Amino acid sequence: MATLDDLKKRIASVKSTQKITKAMKMVAAAKLRRAQENAEKGRPYSEKMNNIILNLSSGISDKENAPKLLSGTGEDKVHLCIVLTSDRGLCGGFNTNIIKKAKTYFQKISDEGKTLKIITVGSKGYDQLKRVYKDAIVERISFKDSKTINYLDAEKVGKMIIENFEKEEFDVCTIFYNKFKNVITQIPQEQQIIPLKTSEAEENSSEDNYEFEPDEDEILSNLLPKNISTQIFKAMLENSASEQGSRMSAMDNATRNAGEMVDKLTIEYNRSRQAAITKELIEIISGAESL
């Protein structure tokens, strides 16, 4: 049985932890407001650009001179997967959920006899995936030192991917990230960004009608690389908001659990103290009676 001193130390320790988790919850809440606002602002732009690309591509995706970013390499042998996770922990199941979805895709690729290549964005993703897929990881990226998510970071990733694609180092590129819904819910997403899915283009072809100048081919050649960077940027914004929402929820649960533990330990401390006092009184009374 724990002594009174041990219980006092445990209560003090849990209270100290509770203060930390409460502070982290407040910091995450402040960051969440900004991250959520950025993610919501970025959605209309990325969706509209993607729709324009899909509309343009519906008419030329079968042409021999169609951009490779649209038509692909003609092969489906090497798959490049970009997995977005966090650089910091204490965010609940945020990283675990997206890693789980990515691993399901990895297994499917392996079962089909295709080659897998992985780029991890965020140190937590690398730490988890290196145990099984170390040989498949071709690049690890971290924005730990960046205070905010910015388009230039996404553009750097986009340019690197396009350069590798032009060197025919992969045939298909898919990005994995968490889409922010609310503080409690973040939905793991899987989005193919190279080549553009022709099925999506066909579905979207009748939604909007545009007149293009000079022509679709030239506009597509300029817009496709920008669209890839835009879709990566959107994924990064969604992931950032999801991370802060998950961390806020996790720290809120930790703070409540710490409070409950303090209550239980306090009750145990009071009972132990009462038992010690009762024991001392009995010993005093017994000693007095013996005299």
UniProtKB/Swiss-Prot annotation:
<dbReference type="GO" id="GO:0046933">
    <property type="term" value="F:proton-transporting ATP synthase activity, rotational mechanism"/>
</dbReference>
<keyword id="KW-0472">Membrane</keyword>
<dbReference type="Pfam" id="PF00231">
    <property type="entry name" value="ATP-synt"/>
</dbReference>
<keyword id="KW-0997">Cell inner membrane</keyword>
<dbReference type="GO" id="GO:0042777">
    <property type="term" value="P:proton motive force-driven plasma membrane ATP synthesis"/>
</dbReference>
<dbReference type="GO" id="GO:0045259">
    <property type="term" value="C:proton-transporting ATP synthase complex"/>
</dbReference>
<dbReference type="InterPro" id="IPR035968">
    <property type="entry name" value="ATP_synth_F1_ATPase_gsu"/>
</dbReference>
<protein>
    <recommendedName>
        <fullName>ATP synthase gamma chain</fullName>
    </recommendedName>
</protein>
<keyword id="KW-0139">CF(1)</keyword>
<dbReference type="GO" id="GO:0005524">
    <property type="term" value="F:ATP binding"/>
</dbReference>
<keyword id="KW-0375">Hydrogen ion transport</keyword>
<keyword id="KW-0406">Ion transport</keyword>
<comment type="function">
    <text>Produces ATP from ADP in the presence of a proton gradient across the membrane. The gamma chain is believed to be important in regulating ATPase activity and the flow of protons through the CF(0) complex.</text>
</comment>
<dbReference type="GO" id="GO:0005886">
    <property type="term" value="C:plasma membrane"/>
</dbReference>
<comment type="subunit">
    <text>F-type ATPases have 2 components, CF(1) - the catalytic core - and CF(0) - the membrane proton channel. CF(1) has five subunits: alpha(3), beta(3), gamma(1), delta(1), epsilon(1). CF(0) has three main subunits: a, b and c.</text>
</comment>
<dbReference type="InterPro" id="IPR000131">
    <property type="entry name" value="ATP_synth_F1_gsu"/>
</dbReference>
<keyword id="KW-1003">Cell membrane</keyword>
<comment type="similarity">
    <text>Belongs to the ATPase gamma chain family.</text>
</comment>
<dbReference type="InterPro" id="IPR023632">
    <property type="entry name" value="ATP_synth_F1_gsu_CS"/>
</dbReference>
<keyword id="KW-0813">Transport</keyword>
<keyword id="KW-0066">ATP synthesis</keyword>
